[in-house]
Swiss-Prot record:
It is a peripheral membrane protein. It comes from Rattus norvegicus. It comes from the Eukaryota. Residues 37-49, 296-306 have a biased composition (Pro residues). The modification Omega-N-methylarginine is found at R269. This is General receptor for phosphoinositides 1-associated scaffold protein.
Length: 394
């Protein structure tokens, strides 16, 4: 609240107090007519500090009006040390509502209430608070007549503080009190807190179990669909996140080697996937076809003969004819790199290439990426492992 607003409020007070001063005018005139003793004039009373006058004027107003004036003006009150003015708290927190109840029962009668003890976990303070509260109050019982309600936390029994005491000891103290029981209760939300805490623990346990099932399903999916076998199960979480990122970026399907494999079922199933590593790595061809029956591989070519002066080179189409129908099986062929041993000469190399064409069809082509595994490792920060560890054993 600004000083301008306070001055306006003081002017309103003076306007309302004007009629009262006019009614008291005769008394004041009589007082003026009375003789005054001779002598030096008395010193005038020192004016109070401006802050004291403001606080004295504010104490006469209702707190609601002060709150409204502060909200409208957007200002703050000047602070004064040692001031007796305090904001009144009309909405006391339920956790601070303590009450003392006295329960009286007959000789063959019970108090008519039930208690429970829960442990509330405080993660910030790393401790467990044991709270004993009233969970049920019977109708027309001494507890109900005394004003005991469900949800009241028991703070003391017969003047003895029971905070932190075990449940069995509290029950023994209540039973040993006789026909008169004096309880100090603290109303709070202990029941609701305990229920929510138990529910939270149950949901966490369920989430942990479901997460384990999800990880096992991810392992099976990666093994069946992509042929990946990794010892570290955390790699599957990374693969899933990378795949979702690639889907969101629009790179799949089609741009990566396994892009068409993850396409919709309505897409073309026939095709070939090829991933080529470095010069020291082997080359793998995995083909997926759709059809009724598998086709037998063409027979190996006859041994090479020295070409004569009038003979010509045997074309690859004669050695390996074109494939007939589509296959329904998936196969993986490992082809030795150039100079990789295993001999056979030019006809052996031609037969190997023709055999790859017979398996993978005419759609076999090399992707523009050197190694998909090397590209995938760029998306996985901190994963510095050799390529042999993630290599598929097909």
């Amino acid at each position: 609240m600004t000083l301008r607003r306070l001055r306006k409020l003081q002017q309103k007070e003076e306007a309302t107090a004007a009629p009262d001063l006019a009614g008291r005018a005769p008394d004041s005139e009589a007082a003026r007519a009375a003789p005054t003793p001779s002598g030096p004039p008395a010193a005038a009373a020192p004016p109070g500090a401006p802050g004291d006058e403001l606080y004295a004027a504010l104490e006469d107003y209702h707190p609601a009006e002060l709150y409204r004036a502060l909200a409208v003006s957007g200002g703050t009150l000047p602070r004064r040390k040692g001031s007796g003015f305090r904001w009144k708290n009309f909405t006391q927190s339920p956790e601070q509502q303590r009450k003392v109840l006295t329960l009286e029962k007959g000789d063959n009668q019970t108090f008519g209430f039930e208690i429970q003890t829960y442990g509330l976990h405080h993660r910030e303070e790393q401790r467990v608070e044991m709270v004993t509260f009233v969970c049920r109050v019977h109708e027309s019982s001494p507890a109900q007549l005394a004003g005991l309600t469900p949800g009241d936390t028991i703070a003391s029994v017969n003047g003895l503080n029971v905070e932190g005491i075990r449940h069995r000891e509290i029950v023994d103290i209540i039973k040993a009190s006789g026909n008169v029981l004096r309880l100090e209760t603290l109303y709070g939300t202990s029941i609701r807190k305990a229920e929510l805490e138990a529910r939270l623990q149950y949901l966490k346990q369920t989430l942990y179990e479901k997460w384990g099932e999800y990880r096992s399903l991810m392992v099976q999916e990666q093994r069946l669909v992509h042929g990946l076998v990794v010892k570290d199960p955390s790699i599957y979480d990374t693969l899933e996140s990378v795949r979702s990122c690639l889907y969101g970026a629009g790179l799949l399907p089609g741009s990566l080697p396994f892009g068409p494999l993850l396409a919709a079922p309505g897409g073309a199933r026939g095709g070939s996937r090829r991933a080529k590593g470095d010069t020291d790595d082997a080359v793998y061809h995995t083909c997926f076809f759709g059809g009724a029956e598998p086709q037998a591989l063409p027979p190996p070519p006859p041994p090479a003969r020295a070409p004569g002066p009038g003979s010509a080179e045997t074309p690859a189409s004669v050695l390996c004819p074109a494939p007939r129908a589509t296959l329904s099986r998936s196969a993986s062929v490992r082809c030795a790199g150039p100079g990789g041993g295993g001999g056979g000469g030019a006809p052996g190399a031609l037969w190997t290439e023709a055999r790859e064409q017979a398996l993978c069809g005419a759609g076999l082509r090399k992707t523009k990426y050197r190694s998909f595994r090397r590209r995938l490792l760029k998306f996985i920060p901190g994963l510095n492992r050799s390529l042999e560890e993630e290599e598929s054993q097909l």
